[in-house]
Amino acid sequence: MTKLNAQVKGSLNVTTPGVQIWRIEAMQMVPVSSSTYGSFFDGDCYIVLAIHKTGSNLSYDIHYWIGQDSSQDEQGAAAIYTTLMDDFLKGRAVQHREVQGNESEAFRGYFKQGIVIRKGGVASGMKKVETNSYDIQRLLHVKGKRNVVAGEVEMSWKSFNRGDVFLLDLGKLIIQWNGPESNRMERLRGMTLAKEIRDQERGGRTYVGVVDGEDEKASPQLMEIMNYVLGQRKELKAAVPDTVVEPALKAALKLYHVSDSEGKVVVREVATRPLTQDLLSHEDCYILDQGGLKIYVWKGKNANPQEKKEAMNQALNFIKAKQYPPSTQVEVQNDGAESAVFQQLFQKWTVPNQTSGLGKTHTVGSVAKVEQVKFDATSMHVQPQVAAQQKMVDDGSGEVEIWRIENLDLVPVESKWVGHFYGGDCYLLLYTYLIGEKQHYLLYIWQGSQASQDEITASAYQAVILDQKYNNEPVQIRVPMGKEPPHLMSIFKGRMVVYQGGTSRANSTEPVPSTRLFQVRGTSVNNTKAFEVPARATSLNSNDIFVLKTQSCCYLWCGKGCSGDEREMAKMVADTISRTEKQVVVEGQEPANFWVALGGKAPYASSKRLQEETLVITPRLFECSNQTGRFLATEIPDFNQDDLEEDDVFLLDVWDQVFFWIGKNANEDEKKAAAVTAQEYLKTHPSGRDPETPIIVVKQGYEPPTFTGWFLAWDPFKWSDSKSYEDLKAELGNSGDWSQITAEIKNPKPDVFNANTNLSSGPLPIFPLEQLVNKPAEELPQGVDPSRREEHLSIEDFTKALGMTPAAFSALPRWKQQNLKKEKGLF
């Protein structure tokens, strides 16, 4: 087992995106049929390779999954093969350790229809998942709201609780029982899994029935079957609350240096949050502890080979030393092939030798390179991915209405002040644009840095009222002063001016400064603004253009590093600042009065600026909730439009903007708390995010291309064609002849047990226990079937000998029945 065998290499596809699975059999990797992906035996270990494609780049994740009843040898083999596969991929993969019952969201996300965990394993004769087999009796406990995992539990009412979904699988019939406290999404996921079992394992020849626990009387025949199989029910157990992970734990980062240079492994804490990339040395290995929730191991490319080889063991030893649960998730990161999730635990992440445009050497929170596309307004709706990267829904030529907050109310801004934004004010801007014949709206909420808290609160309140006036269709964009997005600037065609403070109100008594200095940034009408800075020489920068307005004249100061396009745009915006003739001043040739106006010469930034970074980021989607009174965000890996559920709210993080998507059936409290929830996300982000990051609220059905462009193949008609839980339940309810199925189940074959089976009245004669236990076949009484000794027992003797009722015994997999009979001398 020192290298990947030829069979594995032959079956290994490293160029096609998707999932490949192997099972450990006799210490070898054996490919699993794709028709059974999503089914795992708890007595086995598996290796799952996931390949992702971003642009032209491929990335790899290797997960090894440990069943709760697997052997130590199998677990060790899975870990070794994971390392060998990573070596085969030249260290480009992220390794994950997955333990049954505590699988990562990334792992669950590969199996959109759900995961089914079965009893048994290859060592006990369970070679594969049988299809088109109806000789089945099992109870599946379905857990999870989004990517579900269903595990076999004891086939008894004792296994049920009020808060979860259960599938009673009887071969020709699957009954889904929904706990009265389960939610619609959990029920829908359970139904999807039931249909998957029906279609994939039974060729569509199994009936599916649904019982809602709060209204069992509506399904009398299905309840009759359940009580027949499971026995009469007693009081149901209370709902088991889902595990809640505090955001503070996710943000609790500690970095440890790992070394064995002295002959023994030494783990030493070197830093806590916030973390910076320069803490990681290429010559060493590190452990990053995320509040005990997940352990990352980072392997420097020049680290000791033995240290790198032992990375996973180091993590497991660390977990033991910290007394964390054995099921704690572990990821091994290779130097240069880190996942986006790992990178975003750091304040800033540099990708060496990656350029996009002249002089750009790195991107924030990114591993993907995206080709820069020249702005073309006509492409925004045809190519929403371009709109997403450019952050533009169009070229800003739509209709505009602007209001200022005055006395906590909305007052229209006079035309002469349109484009002027004062730091002491808050503004609402409604932008209307067309896609085809349909009107769409953007509602910008601009909040000055010196505005009062009452005005900021009023701006949010007035935005809600305006939103309702337009039938909740506008996309709301919160813009803190200084964070103006490109599209907002494009509306003013290069004439946007932002003042440090003050107001444009007619009755203002605030004095206007006699000298003002504005820094101008931008190369076109779509990205230019002038931003007021302190009127002193230290504010200057050789890379930019500045407008200096005095009582007597207006200077246009051009730094040596500015371009011709920047000079042209500066002339345009300068006309907005002052109507007087502009005196162009080249850096180094300033007249004396220029320095007098700035209070005298002083040193200023004159080093050449690196090319402006265009952020190329890895977008991340989170399902959000505050139902427990605490903000929770669950990441959805490899997301697509199907992950956006109508009952929920979601957060799409594209680093320099945060979108908050609201489903039409979302909780009212969550709708109202959208902006607050997004701000809480930024505050609790492990990397220490800028709390002033713009927040954009998007409603289902009114998504702008700047949002849809982050999703592959967005379908605007998706929700109009989708089926609700009630629709699917109605369909399934019409599929079964329950009376015929009930008759078949209540008159089973002789070798099928249920809670009401009376063995003494069956076709087989009854004998005392001592005549059947540990007896060779030739010594058994006449009439005894040696392979069915347990069926010749009275119920009392059966329970005494096997330690369970016949119904519980019949619920066990055949391999477990056989093992138990051997153990008790009845085989």
Swiss-Prot record:
Residues found modified as Phosphoserine: S366, S735
Listed InterPro entries: ADF-H/Gelsolin-like_dom_sf, Gelsolin-like_dom, Gelsolin-like_dom_sf, Villin/Gelsolin, Villin_headpiece, Villin_headpiece_dom_sf
Keyword ATP-binding on entry: no
Region (LPA/PIP2-binding site 3): 816-824
Processing after translation: Phosphorylated on tyrosine residues by SRC. The unphosphorylated form increases the initial rate of actin-nucleating activity, whereas the tyrosine-phosphorylated form inhibits actin-nucleating activity, enhances actin-bundling activity and enhances actin-severing activity by reducing high Ca(2+) requirements. The tyrosine-phosphorylated form does not regulate actin-capping activity.
Region LPA/PIP2-binding site 1, residue ranges: 112-119
Spans annotated as Core: 1-734
LPA/PIP2-binding site 2, as annotated region: 138-146
Domain HP: 761-827
Subunit annotation: Monomer. Homodimer; homodimerization is necessary for actin-bundling. Associates with F-actin; phosphorylation at tyrosine residues decreases the association with F-actin. Interacts (phosphorylated at C-terminus tyrosine phosphorylation sites) with PLCG1 (via the SH2 domains). Interacts (phosphorylated form) with PLCG1; the interaction is enhanced by hepatocyte growth factor (HGF).
Function (record text): Epithelial cell-specific Ca(2+)-regulated actin-modifying protein that modulates the reorganization of microvillar actin filaments. Plays a role in the actin nucleation, actin filament bundle assembly, actin filament capping and severing. Binds phosphatidylinositol 4,5-bisphosphate (PIP2) and lysophosphatidic acid (LPA); binds LPA with higher affinity than PIP2. Binding to LPA increases its phosphorylation by SRC and inhibits all actin-modifying activities. Binding to PIP2 inhibits actin-capping and -severing activities but enhances actin-bundling activity.
Family: Belongs to the villin/gelsolin family.
Protein name: Villin-1
Source organism of the structure: Sus scrofa (Pig)
Organism lineage string: Eukaryota, Metazoa, Chordata, Craniata, Vertebrata
